[in-house]
Amino acid sequence: TQMTHQWSRREEQQLPYKIVESGPVQEVVEEEPNLYDLPLCLHSDGNNGKYITGGVLIAKHPDMPMMNASFNRCQLVAKDKLHVRMMPPQHLGIYYEMAEKQNKPLELAIVLGSSPAMMYSAASKIPIDRDELEFAGALSGEQMEVVRCKTIDVLVPANAEIVIEGKVLPNVREEEGPFGEFTDSYVPIMKNHAFQVTAITHRKDAFWHDIYAGGREDLNLLGLPIESEVFNHIRKFATPEDILD
């Protein structure tokens, strides 16, 4: 497809972001956050509570100035606390392991209402030494404007809708799940990570973006990077005449 060709052409590219002083996503700053004020959804009857599924999770590398972005399910457990599933080999899980070895929390922002380029970058499989905010710029062809979070040292898209700021606590695992996954089955209760919320910022007229696991949006987001990866492998062993869209 045309999108696959464009992805393959741009996946080696980076476009540096631009740090700005303020942006729409920080029009309102809630220093005493209450997650119960947000419209989290109960996606399946067997889920153990409400989840954030459409959030792009952005974290800074513990030792280097680069940002990772990914999708991870986040279970609501208190007005200022979420349980987050993030395990190696996913890059966010590796970031957490690095921070935990230093007995430090991992600063993390959950971004709702990102641009399509940011969301596709978060779903990508680019190497861990690449910055996914810069990759989002390469995908869109435009320099992304970012702002620094209010309570943590993480950069987020200035034009997003909502940002939940916080820290993933070291050496803490608590029960999360069950959760209905894209496989049309439930993952069981497991020990996962505790995310302590420190602030919420948002537009004055912010909207909430939700993704149903296994729905069309979910499969499109996850499918394009995989399709491109398969396409690139085929190109290594086939002539141009052998490849059909």
Please tell me what each predicted stretch does.
Residues 1-194, 198-245:
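Extended, highly charged
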